């Protein structure tokens, strides 16, 4: 009973924080609101450790039925909390990163008048993510799924007076609604064919669903898994549905850290892992997931190379790392995917919040306009360096263990996406060093007064990052130990399912495969330092007056026109033209169609329908009003005229007949 109450508290404390700060927004004291938000989230994080020790390490499963929700005939759905090893590790990632972001926000948003509203939205965001990962059925999961989508809209567009923030929020909302349409179709299909939305009932029907062929060689399970994965692609920003993610940087930096590290974007990876029982019986969709993940990790990393906005580089890095996670799930290494999800939560939050400290100090996001900040902000420099090395996968940091686990699984599965993963690892190291060299080394490009006043942020912003540094160091070692348990899937043995135990295949990979990820990371580091150590390194602008004294002049236009390297750089700089393609193929046709409907609705239907009728009535009433002159002789004329017309009518009638 005690553990059940703790589970309820973990989820309800963020909700209570959001409700209290949201309802009493205008009357509550600012300091009290901050204490409530950070205190409640910190308690939730501490409670999650207790549940991790009980459920995760001891192998217990907690299932709490809170109250009935839907009951139609034999179809029943309850509000429930389901805690197993997978949920408990997600609780750790979500609550700890969220509580750190809440504390960091006290300093970052200190001068913002809407800080209480901001904390309310952050807490609500956390609640929906916790509800998502603790559900025991697809409908409750969809409730949390849509909840994090709505909260992301509110937080990305938090500065609603800023037009670009509003556009980014709408863009994120619409793209996620498009993918969520596929997701809800998948849930409906599950309910139709299984008669239930509960995980236990649906997952036990996986083999049966795989034998129901609907056309060609596709089973109904293939369709279900495809629809669910399309939903995951939108939420986790995979290639094709990724375009909202960099625009989400318009929100405050703590929002970026929360969205990209522990909530929302990780929901898709969690869903695939939770539904491993379904996906294992759909090998075709698993291959599709592997390809999408592998292509995304290389695709996003290549874009990050060419960006100059510090937050957008890290955003594309998130997109790339999510690709790694999906690639792991695609080769049935769900445990490796979740392992990387958790380690990534710590070092990516560290990177975002360190970037926030830089932005807070110099009020600039273009890395080519910074430089030489390592002496001004040594703690931030150290934090960013640790986060970057963890991202690259350097031993003994967390990324080394989790990324290595994914690439080993990809290699052992025989997937050619292993090559994509290795290539992405090199690019990851290059763009990580690009930020470090241009922001913290070299000659500063900042204005003199800005550079002189640059300093470390307040302790309320710096101190919480110590926990993220600890997580970036030790989460990998702990995770490696948990996965090494003498059971299939290690720590996740009761949560994940493998139709073919891939673990036997990778128990003894070649030594060079184990060392290759870190080796290519080191190559990328050296390359990044070489390319960006010069203060005259180019920023790839659209036009440049001269290429003289520029080390990387090979990328400029040749005397014969555009070189292949310039063409590639333009493609990368313009993000493979996805926005332009969508604008041409989707946005403009929809706008044209909307204009056509507007013409038909406003200019034809309304003009000759309700509006036209009202104009006729108005004209008639005006004419009628003019008859009422108030003069007796006018009324006498009307009477005489009426009598004359009446008599004339009857006389004419008699003459005719």
UniProtKB/Swiss-Prot annotation:
GO terms for biological process: ATP synthesis coupled electron transport; electron transport coupled proton transport. Gene3D superfamilies: 1.20.5.2700. GO terms for molecular function: NADH dehydrogenase (ubiquinone) activity; quinone binding. Its EC number is 7.1.1.-. It comes from the Bacteria. NDH-1 shuttles electrons from NADH, via FMN and iron-sulfur (Fe-S) centers, to quinones in the respiratory chain. Couples the redox reaction to proton translocation (for every two electrons transferred, four hydrogen ions are translocated across the cytoplasmic membrane), and thus conserves the redox energy in a proton gradient. This is NADH-quinone oxidoreductase subunit L.
